[in-house]
Structures are given as structure tokens and as C-alpha cells.
């Protein structure tokens, strides 16, 4: 790992993967830093294999690197490609998580980017209001790395926060965030799972005796969804409450989540036909976090924008999920799933530019949005689209010797379109 790069991408999840690929393909010397030992972020670390946001109510929308990734997975027989189905099924495609690690790192390396695993960013280099690099901790010590542009794809907005960016956190009245989840991969399933909206309520009803007997905690709904390998499914049900940026809370979630997972699978064995011989093959090594910091940018995407299928002159990515999906922040609350059918909406480039800071972009879950808009835009395919835009912008800024904020948005959009991004 060298001491100077054109572009440093922090975080190897969906947004970071796309950022690094796009930046490197456009000629920037690009370093991708990931604090764990593989790429994929929420999709692999937290085991959320449902890549959501490929299409809106009117049909296929998202192309570019997100589509390229899915097609690479399909070629290897490692994805359930739902694009041919009707909405909402068409917006989800399920992937094999182990294969996803291999495919994503192959795409990043073939693009020409460098990956450094097990690298934790602990500080930011700044001159006045300009981010000039990062400080990273590895098993070999601490290193300062300069960069013309840093892209924060950490999900939690960690780098932007270290740089002093303004951000919103949780809901306005009390700062609480949506519950996080321990995902569970299981094998030995003989029940055919095809429709979460039908399968979930059926399984939940069968588990009522287990809830009544306190064999498991109360669940409003048990989501069991298929995986590409025969007999495998993943369960997205356990909910853990608190702040994901509280170190002890986030640590406790791991053992609490594993305890919930084992109790739940035992109940499935006992009460649900088709799950009699189901067993845990893996639980997430990271909790699936839905909400934390939203870095305030030059524009804040709004609920009205999302629901009205807004178009912007600097729209560089699509939000395709036709719903505002707000999970419970407390156990006694009800989730909100507010559907709308107006069509996909633009995510403006200004939402990726932290207000008052130069030398830095954000992409993914930490975008600039109000809470309802964020609850739609946070999906992983949307995050990849933002990542491709941010990586492309960073490389253009380097080649033009400009700050990201100084780029011509129309030129950026033309470049994305030339890269098969449907805008």
C-alpha cells in the first residue's frame, strides 16, 4: 500500500465496490479500503443476499455496474434473477453470498483498483475545509495516505463524520433509528419459497404457539426467502434496537442475534412443515444495519421527491424501490411500508457532496436525504448506482484537476450514459 493515490474509496460494500470499479476504469489510481477480509458489505458480512432496487413498477430501470454484477452472478449460476417477474418481485434478485465475494473482488481488481483488506480508517487528513487523505490502521501499524478525492462508502458515514461533516441521525423527535437485524442462512429446507408476501404470513401463523410459549420472542412477521442453492433459504426477522454507532450496543447485538437465530430455527423445526430438518449454515459476522448517519449535502433528497418520481438536472442515479420502508425503532411500534407507484426517482449528484467540504464524496446509505426518502434510497442496488456515479465523478475531478463540486454535472451524466448507465 502506497502513501498517495488519486482516489481512495473507504468501505467495500455495494457502494464502495461500484465506486472503485468506476474510478479505476476511468484511469484514476484507486485504492479500496475494507476493514474486513472480503468485499460485499451488507450483502456478505451481514448476509443480506437480496439485491433490491433493480426495477420500478414500470419495468427495468437500473443498468451500469449493478446490472453487470448481477449478470456475472447469473453466468455462474449464483443468482436468482427476478427481472422477468412482475413488480415487486422484479426489483429483488437473490445471490449466493460466497460467490459474491469472489465476483466483486474480481471485478474491482480487473478494473485496475487496488484492494487493502483488514484496514480500518481512524482519521482524516485535512487542509482547511478540504479532505486530503485518510489515516488507516492495519495489523502492521498506522499509515497516512494522501488522496485527491476520498469517497466515503462506509454506510455509517464514518469518514465524513471524522472530517467534520454535518449529519442527521435517526428520527427528529428522539434520534432513534430503525432496528437492525441478524440474518440467518439455513439449509435442509424442503418447503418451496416463492412469494415472501404469502410465505411470511403463513410461517408466522404457524409459529404463534412458539411465541405464546416464549420459545421465541414475538415477531410480527418471519421473512424466509430462497437462495440459489437447493434447500437453502435466508431469514430476515430478528430485530435489535439501539444505535449502530454505540460500540457496546453493536457488540452485544452479535451474541443476542445469534441466540435469537438458534431459538428461531429450533421453533421452525418444531412447528413449520418443510423446515423439520432445517439447520443454520451461517449467521452474519456483522449485524444488518438499516439506518445511522445521513450526511447533509448540497441537496437533501425529500419524501416529496421520492413519491413524485422527481427528475433533476444533476440526477446521476436511480432510486427504484416504490416504497418508503421504515422498520420499527422500538419493540412496541409498527413498521411503515408506504407504497407508491409513480416510478423511479433521480438521486442528484448534490446528495453525494457533503456540505462545506471539498475533496470528499459520499455514496450509499449515508447519502443526503430526509428520513422518509432515505428509507427508500437505502437499498443496495441504489447504493451501487450512487457508487458508480461517485467513482466516475472522482476520476473526472482528478483528471480535470478540479474539486468534485466543480464538475459539470451534464458532463458527468454524459460520461455515465456512455458507460451504459440508463439516466
Which residue stretches match the model-derived regions?
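Beta1/beta-strand and adjacent pyrophosphate-binding region of the FAD-binding site
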Residues: 2-13
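Conserved N-terminal/central alpha/beta ligand/cofactor-binding core
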Residues: 22, 28-29, 34-127, 178, ...
Amino acid at each position: 500500500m502506497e502513501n498517495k493515490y488519486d482516489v481512495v474509496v473507504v468501505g467495500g460494500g455495494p457502494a464502495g465496490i461500484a465506486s472503485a470499479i468506476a474510478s479505476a476504469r476511468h484511469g484514476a489510481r484507486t485504492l479500496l479500503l475494507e476493514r474486513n477480509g472480503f468485499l460485499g458489505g451488507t450483502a456478505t458480512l451481514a448476509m443480506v443476499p437480496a439485491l433490491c432496487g433493480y426495477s420500478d413498477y414500470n419495468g427495468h430501470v437500473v443498468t451500469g455496474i449493478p446490472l453487470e454484477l448481477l449478470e456475472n452472478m447469473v453466468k455462474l449460476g449464483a443468482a436468482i434473477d427476478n427481472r422477468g417477474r412482475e413488480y415487486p418481485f422484479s426489483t429483488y434478485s437473490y445471490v449466493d453470498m460466497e460467490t459474491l465475494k469472489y465476483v466483486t473482488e474480481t471485478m474491482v481488481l480487473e478494473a485496475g483498483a487496488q484492494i487493502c483488506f483488514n484496514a480500518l480508517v481512524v482519521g482524516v487528513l485535512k487542509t482547511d475545509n478540504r479532505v486530503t487523505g485518510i489515516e488507516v490502521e492495519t495489523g502492521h501499524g498506522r499509515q497516512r495516505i494522501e488522496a485527491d478525492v476520498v469517497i466515503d462508502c462506509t454506510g455509517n458515514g464514518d469518514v465524513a463524520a471524522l472530517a467534520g461533516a454535518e449529519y442527521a441521525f435517526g428520527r427528529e423527535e428522539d434520534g432513534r433509528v430503525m432496528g437492525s437485524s441478524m440474518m440467518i442462512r439455513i439449509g435442509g429446507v424442503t418447503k418451496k419459497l416463492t412469494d415472501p408476501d404469502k410465505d411470511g404470513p403463513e410461517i408466522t401463523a404457524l409459529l404463534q404457539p412458539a411465541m405464546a410459549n416464549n420459545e421465541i420472542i414475538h415477531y410480527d412477521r418471519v421473512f424466509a426467502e430462497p437462495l440459489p442453492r437447493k434447500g437453502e433459504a435466508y431469514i430476515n426477522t430478528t430485530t435489535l434496537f439501539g444505535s449502530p454507532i454505540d460500540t457496546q450496543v453493536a457488540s452485544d447485538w452479535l451474541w443476542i442475534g445469534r441466540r435469537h437465530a438458534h431459538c428461531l430455527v429450533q421453533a421452525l423445526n418444531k412447528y413449520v412443515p418443510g423446515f423439520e430438518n432445517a439447520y443454520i449454515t451461517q449467521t452474519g459476522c456483522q449485524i444488518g444495519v438499516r439506518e445511522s448517519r445521513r450526511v447533509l449535502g448540497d441537496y437533501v433528497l425529500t419524501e416529496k421527491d421520492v413519491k413524485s418520481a422527481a427528475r433533476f438536472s444533476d440526477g446521476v442515479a436511480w432510486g427504484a424501490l416504490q416504497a418508503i420502508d421504515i422498520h420499527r425503532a422500538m419493540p412496541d411500534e409498527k413498521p411503515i411500508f408506504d407504497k407508491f407507484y409513480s416510478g423511479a426517482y433521480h438521486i442528484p449528484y448534490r446528495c453525494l457532496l457533503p456540505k462545506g467540504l471539498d475533496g470528499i464524496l459520499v455514496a450509499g446509505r449515508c447519502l443526503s436525504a430526509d428520513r422518509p426518502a432515505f428509507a427508500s434510497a437505502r437499498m443496495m442496488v441504489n447504493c451501487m448506482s450512487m457508487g458508480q456515479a461517485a467513482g466516475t465523478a472522482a476520476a473526472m475531478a482528478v483528471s480535470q484537476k478540479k474539486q468534485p463540486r466543480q464538475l459539470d454535472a451534464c458532463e458527468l451524466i454524459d460520461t455515465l450514459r456512455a458507460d451504459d448507465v440508463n439516466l
